Structure formats: C-alpha cells, structure tokens
Amino acid sequence: MTINFTNNDNNVYYARRSRNDAVEGFLLASMASGVVMRTLPYFSKPFINQLKQEHINNKEYVGSLLKGLSDSGLEKLGVTIKNTVFNKEDLIKVGTNLEPLIQDKEIKFGLNATYTPRIKRVKLNLDKASICGFHELGHAMNNLQGKFGNVLQKMRYPGYVLAGLLGTISLFPRKKAKGDKQNVWSFIQDNCAKIAFIGMLPTVAEEALASYKGTKLAKASGVDGSALKNLKRLYGKALISYIGYAAVTSLSVYIASKITEHFTRPKRIEIPSQFY
C-alpha cells in the first residue's frame, strides 16, 4: 500500500492512495462481484424443480388456460398464445454442442414462458408448461388492462440498466474522504447498492402483480383443489427467485463498492493548529 499526503491549507491533510492500490482494488472488487453473481441460478432451482414435476399435470391447466384467455377479454385485445415446441431441426441439436443454438430452448423444454408486450404474445410449451401461462396472461393484464401494472412493466428495462450502471460505478475510485462535503457523484458512489436495489424493485413488483392476477384468472377459469395449490406454490417460488436476483444484484454492487472504497478512498486527517 502506498499513501501520498496532500494539504489543502486548512490544517487538513489527505492520505491519498496510489494508482497501484486503485488497480488492485478494481481487480478484487470485480472478482468478488462476479463470484456473488454466480449464485443467481440457485435462486431459480426450486422453481425449475417444481415446474419439471408439473409437466405430468399439464392436462389440469391447459383447458383452463385457453378458457382464461377468452374469458379475461385478452383475446379480444389481440393477445395470442404460441405453442412453442421442438421442431425436427431442433431435435437433431438436442444433446449436442449445437443445443445452445436452439431458439427459445428453455421454453421448448417447458422450463420457461414469456410474454412480449410489443406483439401481445405469450410463448410457452402448451404440452408441458401450461401452468405458467396464467402468470404470463397476468403480464398481459398489466400491459393492457391496468395503468399501475403498465407503468411497472415500462420501468423494468430502465431499472435493469440502472442496476447495471451502478455495478460499473461501484468500481470507480473514491475521490472524497469520509467527512468531506458530498456532491451528487459522491452520493451516488456511497449509495450505489441501495440505488441498484431500487432499480430492481419494478421487476419484483410487476412479477408479483402478474402472479396475483394470473392466480385469480386460474381460479376463475376452473383451476381448483390441489392444482390451484400447486400453481400458487410455483408462482411463490418464481417470485422468490426474482427477490433473490434483486438482493444478489445489490449485494454484488455493495461488495464491489466497499472493496473499491477500501483501496481508493483518501483518509481525511485534521491537525490541530497548535502543532504549527
């Protein structure tokens, strides 16, 4: 560690860190942040594991899903469901090095589903993962039948961008010492983890609202008993995964920020005037 002392002529000295310290801090912060982000898949495992089990129960949901599309009024608004399954070309690639090239691979395996607001389309495997369709129709309701849900949906992408930007900012050297007057930039640096978490909140909130509306639609469309209970459990696990993503993202930014701060923040040293 190298420390350089500078003075601002007000009996205040700053122990400033060297360029080598900044580089070391950047590398360690980047590595630590990457390690934390690698835990993300673990949050979705409970959801994926249950969804695989629900494939054999698909018939309990598929009819109600199509009924819900019609009864909800979404079909009249132009919402469609595309049954997304493997074609012959895809099947040749499964189990080979070409498998990652399969378009919508996770959806075709019945492990995911999506709603695209721009074209009002739900994509899922109707032969395996119809249970996910009610949640996706919940996204469609947010998009087309509710102002609050629509606002949340539009805030998702900017929130992702903000969180990613804060991850980068967390790696920038600190110029101001503790106790110095803050400006906007130093405030952002000192609070980047909190701001990153806030950036992820619209996604969590919109997902929760989609699950709530999807569950209500499933119940109104005839899903009941153990099938409804399993649906609620699956949607709860999905929400936990999004909460986990938000928490891990902010934790990653926090750790990177603290490491960078440790290696780069100047230390403010006030020397009493009687020593002059």
Predicted regions and their residues:
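Short, compositionally biased, intrinsically disordered N-terminal export/targeting signals
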Residues: M1-V12
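Transmembrane alpha-helix/interfacial motif
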Residues: M37-K45
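Cytosolic juxtamembrane segments of membrane proteins
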Residues: I56-S64, Y212-V223
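Catalytic Zn2+-binding segment of zinc metalloproteases
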Residues: E136-L162, I169-P173
